[in-house]
């Protein structure tokens, strides 16, 4: 009797500031899309991963959403005890079909933020002419607000819709293996996955490079039979940009006894700030207001570890909720520019979390992926790779391209705005209020 050939499935995740790539799988069970239940599970899994990452040195950035989506695509191909074990390790309470439906809804929402293809609008009576709006004055010689007179014409700046380039892309790549037709169809339908039937290493890395706008050059060093990839790419202007002329070197305390000078941005405007046990948090919105970066700043210079342990899924959810409800107030914010790259092999991390069957071809059940009984098509995950890049500057957070309208800032500031000086190691979260997803998160211990 011929020996069944073992199939290897790698899971790939990459994030470029946000770009993230990860494999995903899911099956259909039915039920209403519950996006928030889905992202709660992703966020809970993300906090568990962050605790593991935090044992190492240096800055960190990763995408809980990307990793969660990748693992969901894998989960879609599992059955029986393998499915139950994966769902438990991933904090999932939804059934396979519910996970698939919720992912379809989340992807549609997140991919809908890019309005760069939507034409700008002009004030009434004016039309777009090149890079500005132009039209004739009224009979009385006036111009419609906010246009102004320029010679014989009225001119105004076009209004662009709030926009963020947030791309969620998935792929199923076959490099020597095969999958069931209904599994490939599921990924196409619910995850908008591209399917490549003859993939090479160049195909995989080239796809990742393209989907992350070159932020992630390479994700895999070796091929497996079946490759599942998720990529998340983000770039957006701040709702209120920082003035580059105000950026200057400021002290950043690496420890109580060591300080370094780092380029630090300054902004005086209104933000939501909350005080929590051991730390303060501030919400910095992007041009699309449902997207924001949240900074969690420990009260103590060396308090990052305690705050990170305290910020589990429940505390994170409560803190984000408190920020959304908090009225904005005048704030003098100092925030260092920073750029972080990070990569992680997640196989051992998930095994530590109790996920063992998906990595054991003798005992795993991937019959949903293969379309064959487990005994005739032994299959196992052999790679879970995640890479992420983030860059924060005066204009934007980097990892994608985006256009956004400027937001008018109130010029009159009280004499004593709240001081929020990010001059010590801190945590950050890039969140989407519409779905509840933590798209990226990390820590900065040294912004240089």
What are the functions of these language-model segments?
Residues 2-5, 13, 20-120, 157-196, ...:
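Detector for small/aliphatic-rich hydrophobic stretches
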Residues 419-424:
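Short loop/turn motifs at secondary-structure junctions and domain boundaries
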Residues 426-448:
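C-terminal or internal capping secondary-structure element at the end of a domain, subdomain, or sheet
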Residues 133-135, 143, 154-156:
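Short linear proline/tyrosine/threonine-rich motifs used for host-factor recruitment
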Residues 119-123, 139-144:
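Disulfide-braced loops of extracellular cysteine-rich modules
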Residues 126-129, 144-150:
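Extracellular, cysteine-rich, disulfide-stabilized repeat modules with beta-strand cores
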Residues 58-60, 425-428:
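Short loop/turn microsegments at loop-to-beta-strand junctions
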């Amino acid at each position: 009797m011929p020996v069944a050939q073992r199939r290897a499935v790698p899971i790939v995740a990459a994030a470029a500031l946000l770009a993230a790539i990860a494999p995903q799988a899911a099956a259909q069970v039915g039920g209403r899309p519950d996006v928030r239940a889905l992202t709660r599970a992703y966020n809970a899994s993300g906090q568990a991963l962050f605790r593991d990452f935090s044992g190492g040195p240096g800055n960190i950035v990763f995408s809980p959403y990307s990793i969660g989506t990748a693992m969901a695509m894998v989960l879609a191909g599992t059955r029986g005890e393998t499915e139950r074990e994966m769902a438990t390790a991933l904090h999932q309470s939804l059934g396979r079909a519910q996970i698939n439906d919720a992912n379809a809804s989340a992807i549609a929402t997140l991919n809908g933020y890019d309005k760069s293809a939507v034409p700008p609008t002009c004030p009434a009576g004016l039309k777009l002419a090149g890079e500005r709006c132009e039209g004739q004055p009224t009979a009385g010689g006036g111009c419609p607000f906010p246009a102004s007179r320029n010679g014989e014409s009225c001119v105004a700046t076009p209004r662009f819709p709030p926009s963020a380039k947030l791309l969620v892309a998935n792929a199923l790549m076959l490099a020597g293996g095969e999958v069931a037709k209904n599994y490939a169809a599921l990924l196409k339908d619910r995850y908008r996955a591209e399917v490549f039937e003859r993939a090479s290493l160049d195909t995989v890395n080239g796809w990742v490079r393209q989907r992350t706008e070159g932020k992630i050059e390479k994700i895999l060093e070796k091929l497996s039979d079946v490759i599942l990839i998720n990529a998340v790419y983000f770039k957006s202007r701040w709702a209120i940009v920082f003035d580059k002329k105000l950026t200057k070197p400021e002290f950043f305390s690496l420890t109580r006894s060591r300080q370094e000078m780092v380029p630090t941005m300054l902004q005086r405007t209104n933000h939501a700030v909350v005080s929590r046990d051991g730390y303060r948090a501030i919400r910095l919105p992007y041009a699309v207001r449902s997207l924001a970066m949240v900074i969690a700043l420990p009260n103590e210079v060396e308090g990052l570890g305690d705050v990170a342990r305290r910020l589990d899924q429940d505390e994170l959810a409560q803190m984000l909720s408190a920020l959304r409800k908090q009225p904005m107030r005048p704030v003098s914010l100092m925030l260092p520019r920073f750029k972080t790259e990070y990569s992680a092999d997640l196989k051992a991390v998930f095994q530590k979390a109790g996920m063992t069957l998906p990595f054991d071809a003798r005992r795993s059940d991937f019959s949903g992926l293969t379309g064959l009984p487990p005994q005739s098509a032994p299959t196992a995950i052999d790679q879970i790779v995640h890479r992420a890049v983030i860059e924060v500057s005066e204009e934007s957070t980097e990892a994608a391209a985006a256009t956004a309208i400027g937001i008018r800032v109130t010029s009159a500031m009280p004499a004593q705005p709240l001081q929020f000086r990010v001059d010590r190691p801190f945590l950050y979260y890039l969140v989407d209020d519409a779905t509840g997803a933590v798209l990226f998160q990390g820590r900065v211990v040294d912004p240089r």
